[in-house]
Amino acid sequence: MAPNDIISDMLTRIRNACAVRHPTTVVPTTKMTRSIAQVLKEEGFIEGFEEVGEGVKKHLVISLKYKSRGRQPIINTLQRVSKPGLRVYSNRKDLPRVLGGIGIAIISTSKGIMTDREARRQNVGGEVLCYVW
């Protein structure tokens, strides 16, 4: 059965895989999950990702990143902000800063999915999808 909220499903799979120190996790591929994975890779929270499978059965295999000693995950917290039942939007002036700039907020804008810093640079607002730190 397909989940209703694909973003929450993706974040939960990554969070659970980090908790048990798995090297990779698999999530269903959509344009949204691919874009979020790209932002996480660019910001250094994951090693990388690749698409496997064909047609409707495509999945993203996300390689998780850990600190060298003790295998501590780089991602401490993945927090969903905007949910299907309660959407959260922010204009360009009120974009959130996560932990004073240490973490990132992933924003869905009219120019694509990007971090809060990139949205400020491009002077756009949008839907606040999640916080990562």
Curated annotation (Swiss-Prot):
InterPro entries: Ribosomal_uS8, Ribosomal_uS8_CS, Ribosomal_uS8_sf. It comes from the Bacteria. Pfam families: Ribosomal_S8 (PF00410). One of its GO terms (biological process) is translation. Keywords: Ribonucleoprotein, Ribosomal protein, RNA-binding, rRNA-binding. Gene3D superfamilies: 3.30.1370.30, 3.30.1490.10. GO terms for cellular component: ribonucleoprotein complex; ribosome. GO terms for molecular function: rRNA binding; structural constituent of ribosome. Part of the 30S ribosomal subunit. Contacts proteins S5 and S12. One of the primary rRNA binding proteins, it binds directly to 16S rRNA central domain where it helps coordinate assembly of the platform of the 30S subunit. Belongs to the universal ribosomal protein uS8 family. This is Small ribosomal subunit protein uS8. It comes from Crocosphaera subtropica (strain ATCC 51142 / BH68). The gene is rpsH.
